[in-house]
Regions:
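Structured-RNA-binding interfaces characteristic of tRNA pseudouridine synthases
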Residues: 1-220
């Protein structure tokens, strides 16, 4: 099996893409319904399509959207455990404004060497971010989502971006820390690595979305 993203343990995915080469011919509807009977409750096949043999979703990925949830609450909420980063502080307009201001220099094509884990040894660390946007969750005023869209990502890149933004908002890093980390390429200038719980791979765009998709009316 070949996936579109290598998500860390504890990270969630709403739109992970997986390809495999079957030994039997079954239409996409049959795969979607049949696999559902054999998967655990926290994994679901929401769409199936036919792609060429040997298709690798990771190499066909042209854009991804991640969303990270932060909940500002001194008390633990059992309904959100494992699905948010709980911060014992108050979410107000000043926090949101600081996050938005700190995120602004991250949009565009930059060298994100300071925003990757030590385990990531890829030569090229240049990536393009189209969106870095914090917004309050309309269904939960305690929480906000930070949406990050880009052409590709380094290991732990989104989690370090989020950690840096929140470090500045909480006064643990000086204003402009994200921009300085971009310029220096030094991991020490960036913030902490946010925990995996709040991160969701929300959308994956591929150069080839496949054929005969089922269900046909579900967005890819």
């Amino acid at each position: 099996m070949r996936g579109a993203s290598r998500t860390d343990a504890g990270v969630h995915a709403r739109d992970q893409r997986v390809a495999f080469d079957p030994t039997v011919v079954i239409p996409p509807r049959g795969w979607a319904l049949g696999l559902a009977r054999h998967l655990p409750e926290d994994i679901a096949v929401r769409r199936a399509a036919i792609v060429p043999a040997g298709f690798v979703p990771r190499f066909a990925s042209v854009r991804k959207r991640y969303r990270y949830r932060i909940t500002f609450d001194e008390l633990r909420d059992p309904f959100l455990e494992g699905r948010t980063w709980r911060v014992p502080a108050r979410l107000d307009a000043a926090v949101l404004a600081t996050l938005a201001e700190e995120a602004r220099p991250l949009v565009g094509t930059h060298d994100f060497a300071a925003f990757r884990s030590a385990a990531d040894e890829r030569e090229s660390t240049t990536r393009t971010l189209f969106v870095v946007a914090p917004e309050v969750d309309p269904a939960d005023p305690r929480s906000l989502w930070i949406t990050v869209e880009g052409d590709a990502f380094l290991h732990n890149m989104v989690r370090i971006l989020v950690g840096t933004l929140l470090d500045v908002a909480r006064g643990r890093k000086p204003p402009g820390a994200a921009a300085r980390a971009l310029a220096s390429r030094d991991r020490r200038d960036a913030g902490i690595t946010a925990p995996p719980d709040g991160l969701v791979l929300d959308r994956t765009w591929l150069s080839n979305e496949g054929e005969d998709a089922w269900p046909p009316d579900l967005p890819p």
